[in-house]
């Protein structure tokens, strides 16, 4: 949130679609409303900003800046990266665009590091190379309480969703090569989020991770319980973030996960 208010930062939101009607993520609609739509069985999907939207932003930005630096959601999840690149080309704006190969939370941390390096005087080409390497240092795990939205978004088949919900099978997800993939399946949401918590504890016990983001969809109490326990036990800063409407439309609710970037010697 602190960097989102930076005077040199422009945010181009993604879109949430409800029964074919378009809403701007975090502007026209907030996460709580999206979850209400999902509970009411509306068809909720997402869409990246149009090339034209990016073109308009970059035409405005080129009047103020010689070059732009963009970090986008994995191109395996969204067409945002490609739309951004094409929009910059049409606008004639010099842009360094990074495909983060990860989700929004590590991508935000990457952006914060890039902005700090720029403030420290590092050349933009060096920042680009650093972020291209740094983007693979992310770690993300999450799970969901039901499979309906994953099925609605095409991430699992209707058969798998039906059987999974019937047997209370809950997948644990992480990122592989920019894609969200299940790496384990357990019975019940409680066991699933317990596994993720245990994984996080194991990593914190190594003593190298000092900054963690917990993200959730209508699971704040659980996230707060994790935060309280972890900060009592470890020397770690734990943030709690609401899943954005776009991501929440894919996971459904409740959902909970964690992410962090592995430490770097530059910190």
Q: Where do the model's predicted regions map?
A:
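N-terminal glycine-rich anion-binding loop in soluble enzyme alpha/beta folds
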Residues: 1-48, 53
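Mixed-charge interfacial surface used for oligomerization/domain docking
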Residues: 1-21, 63, 67, 76-96, ...
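N-terminal, well-ordered alpha-helical segments
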Residues: 32, 36, 52-59, 82-86, ...
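Glycine-rich phosphate- or other oxyanion-binding loops that anchor nucleotides, phosphorylated ligands
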Residues: 41-75, 128, 135
